[in-house]
Amino acid sequence: MIMDNQAKQQWPGPAGLIPVTSGKAEDANIHNRNFLDHILVEMRVIDATEPDLTTEIFGQKFSSPIMMPAFSHLNKIKNKDVKPMEEYAMAAKEENLLNWVGMENDDDFGNILAVNSKTVRIIKPFADHDIILHQIAFAEQHGAIAVGIDIDHIAGTNGKYDVVDGYPMGPITLKDLKTIVEKTHLPFVAKGVLSVSDALKACEAGCKAIVVSHHHGRIPFGIPPAYALPKIKDALAGSDIKIFADCGIESGYDAYKLLVLGADAVSVGRAILSPLLKEGKNGVIKQIKKMHAELSELMMYTGIKDTRTFDANILHY
């Protein structure tokens, strides 16, 4: 079964575009924010210099370890003249950042790739694996630099396999993951890793990168990615797997903390969503520049000269 471009999709409209957390005890986003805010840094200014933010990912050089998020469906807003998915891809291209795209049909994904930003396609864990393989092949043919799967988007709130836009999700076993990884020559990303166990399985399956994430609180009472990062980094020591992270990165200071804790690069989502919907590409660029300034500031205060020399001993929590 291949995704039908005309498939009906439920969509809450522009008012529902901004993710809202429940604020209840099970809301992983609340625990994530609290954990990040309790991480403090020591100052190391003697011999400190203005840092170099350039970062290598999948053999390509980018201006910063801050990346775009894997948004989905933003082009469904009522204003047909505005294409947010393309707008943030254009921002990524202009700022030389790695772009990510989530669940989109092939036509829409092709339009995003036409912007010519360096883009990773993240695919849902469809129960029908033919959809996964088809979307991987399309990404290969149209110039994506990597592909991956939202391995954490399996369970729905009803305790059954989730259904997204009418498409059933399904489990991804280690055997499944190995088979899918072997079907592509592109670097493969497992997005939604929140344990050493899954990190090691992703590595065993041949993934070239993982995203340490709870997918904006999909799992109730989920641990913060920042909390999981150090153990995952230690477990993957000696491998060539890239470790990315996301969830609640609202500033360059937040980005700094995750980078120090073990991430090679981080994705920002909600921090750019409002500027994206209000001002398009220019709003995203403005926000990213602010985050770059904050990241550079904190790196300079702590004597970090580049994105390859973060020192976890700087943090106190």
Which residues fall in each region the model found?
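Acidic (Asp/Glu)-rich catalytic clusters
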Residues: 57-61, 109-116, 137-143, 203-206
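Active-site cofactor/substrate anionic-group-binding motifs, chiefly glycine-
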Residues: 57-105
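A gly/proline- and charged-residue-enriched helix-loop-helix capping module
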Residues: 89-129
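Charged helix-capping and loop-helix junction motifs
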Residues: 82-86, 224-230, 283
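An N-cap/entry alpha-helix motif that binds or orients negatively charged groups
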Residues: 1-62
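Short beta-alpha connecting loops at secondary-structure transitions
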Residues: 273-283
